[in-house]
């Protein structure tokens, strides 16, 4: 009976400060767009050039941590006493779909163009060497290295959630073993949680800022509807409504509905591109790129380009590592929630092997298709970007395929539904982090989850009003800085507590 009377409403100290901070930042940005752009460029340059090395070392250390979990003393430990909540197939699909939105399709279709037009290591733009290295860098940025980071933190949160029976899931609640209960539940812990939530809100906004133009450009191609900010707002509203429907079904039913559809559809679409684009070339290009990745891996891991100062590692590697860092806690909480009953080794291998295969397939197929279209002069990406923007260039890479109308319909549906999954995962984590007394196996209040979806949608609209990729990239970079330290503290806290309380 006591459990029925527990208050599970929002926690004011971690609910209102992020909203106020985000509101002030958005107001200052919209108030003077020119001044905001100056600040945005300065912040991006400072963080990537001065602190880029720290992000690179973070990823390397976390990779070694993954090996320690897989082959160390906790490998066979089970995350909870219950059997797995989801089947292995649904489990993998939920993980893949939660990390695959239209924002990922955005980069998968266009990323290789930037790599070959502004290549690393002093290579000539659009040269043979640049093209040989283009896909290899995509496999590097979206391969085992970042997934190992996610799996380590997922194990940490699953341990605190299901083994230690933690009642509240937010970063500060995991820091008790490291800083003590007084500081974890006091001002220090509140500051940590607010940094996390502010960064996460902007991260979700950036994903919507990348996803929405793809959908609206699809609508312009299919229906002739002009791409406007008002149309962007309508699309975001539709995502919020669909998310509310999934939430109303509960995590298990809603999660499966939201994840299975884009997962199956994405593999169907990728299979179509693979067949009609050139299966032989794609397999040869992938095989060669794996070899290039292995050859250049040490340089890629530690590439900061301090002498030539070409800007490639700052603009791409550091940006992507900040992207992974800023989403690490949010996604790890969600992935931990659906991994109850799994062993540590099973969770680590499931994420790194399964999700690496998924992202490598996506980037290989889409990147190879874009490269073929460029080499055959079927589309002029620089001209499309200059005249219409990046989203239009991406749409044209899909429209150039056979049966273009059917292909565009498939891409439109995939982008739309996949982003619903992202919003669902993020709203769930935000609600869990801003509510009190939510225990393992329970769901946060419905209205709180829907409320966060609405608020994040507003942030996405504001970022779209700013225009361009630089504000989106800067939001990720700036948000990744405080979470860089938060992630490290969560990791150290897990290691310390596990050594004391997770013995045979």
UniProtKB/Swiss-Prot annotation:
It comes from Shigella dysenteriae serotype 1 (strain Sd197). Belongs to the BCCT transporter (TC 2.A.15) family. CaiT subfamily. The chain crosses the membrane at residues 10-30, 51-71, 92-112, 143-163, 195-215, 231-251, 263-283, 316-336, 347-367, 398-418, 446-466, 475-495. It is found in: Cell inner membrane. It catalyses: 4-(trimethylamino)butanoate(in) + (R)-carnitine(out) = 4-(trimethylamino)butanoate(out) + (R)-carnitine(in). This is L-carnitine/gamma-butyrobetaine antiporter. The gene is caiT. The keyword DNA-binding does not apply. GO terms for molecular function: (R)-carnitine:4-(trimethylammonio)butanoate antiporter activity.
């Amino acid at each position: 009976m006591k459990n029925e009377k527990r208050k599970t409403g929002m926690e004011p100290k971690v609910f209102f400060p992020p909203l106020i901070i985000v509101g002030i930042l958005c107001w200052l940005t919209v108030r003077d767009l020119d001044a905001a752009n100056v600040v945005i460029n300065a912040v991006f340059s400072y963080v990537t050039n001065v602190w880029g090395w720290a992000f690179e070392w973070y990823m390397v250390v976390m990779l070694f941590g993954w090996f320690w979990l897989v082959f160390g003393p906790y490998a066979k430990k089970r995350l909870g006493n219950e059997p797995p909540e989801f089947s292995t197939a649904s489990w993998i699909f939920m993980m893949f779909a939660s990390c695959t939105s239209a924002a990922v399709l955005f980069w998968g279709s266009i990323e290789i163009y930037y790599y070959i037009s502004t290549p690393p290591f002093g290579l000539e733009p659009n040269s043979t060497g640049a093209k040989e290295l283009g896909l290899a860098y995509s496999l590097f940025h979206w391969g085992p290295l970042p997934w190992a980071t996610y799996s380590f933190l997922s194990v940490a949160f699953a341990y605190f959630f299901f083994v230690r029976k933690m009642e509240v899931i937010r970063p500060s609640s995991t820091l008790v073993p490291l800083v003590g209960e007084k500081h974890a539940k006091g001002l220090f812990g509140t500051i940590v949680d607010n940094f996390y939530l502010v960064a996460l809100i902007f991260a979700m906004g950036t994903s919507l800022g990348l996803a929405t133009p793809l959908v609206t450009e699809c609508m312009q191609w299919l229906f002739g509807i002009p791409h406007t900010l008002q149309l962007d707002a309508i699309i975001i509203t539709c995502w919020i409504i669909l998310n509310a429907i999934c939430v109303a079904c509960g995590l298990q039913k809603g999660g499966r509905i939201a994840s299975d559809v884009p997962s199956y559809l994405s593999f169907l679409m990728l299979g179509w591109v693979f067949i009609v684009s050139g299966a032989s070339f794609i397999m040869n290009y992938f095989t060669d790129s794996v070899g290039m990745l292995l050859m250049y891996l040490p340089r890629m891991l530690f590439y900061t380009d301090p002498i030539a100062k070409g800007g490639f590692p700052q603009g791409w590697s550091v940006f992507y590592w900040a992207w992974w860092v800023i989403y690490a806690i949010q996604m790890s909480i969600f992935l931990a929630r659906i991994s109850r009953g799994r062993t540590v080794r099973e969770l680590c291998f499931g994420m790194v092997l399964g999700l690496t295969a998924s992202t490598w397939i996506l980037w290989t197929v889409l990147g190879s298709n874009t490269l073929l279209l460029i080499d055959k002069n079927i589309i002029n990406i620089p001209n499309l970007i200059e005249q219409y923007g990046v989203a239009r260039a991406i749409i044209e890479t899909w429209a150039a395929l056979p049966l273009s109308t059917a292909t565009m319909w498939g891409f439109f549906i995939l982008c739309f539904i996949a982003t619903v999954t992202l919003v669902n995962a993020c709203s769930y984590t935000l609600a869990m982090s801003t509510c009190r007394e939510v225990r393992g196996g329970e769901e946060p209040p419905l209205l709180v989850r829907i409320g966060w979806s609405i608020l994040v949608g507003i942030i996405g609209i504001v970022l779209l009003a700013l225009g361009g990729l630089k504000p989106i990239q800067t939001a990720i970079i700036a948000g990744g800085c405080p979470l860089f330290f938060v992630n490290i503290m969560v990791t150290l806290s897990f290691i310390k507590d596990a050594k004391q309380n997770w013995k045979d």
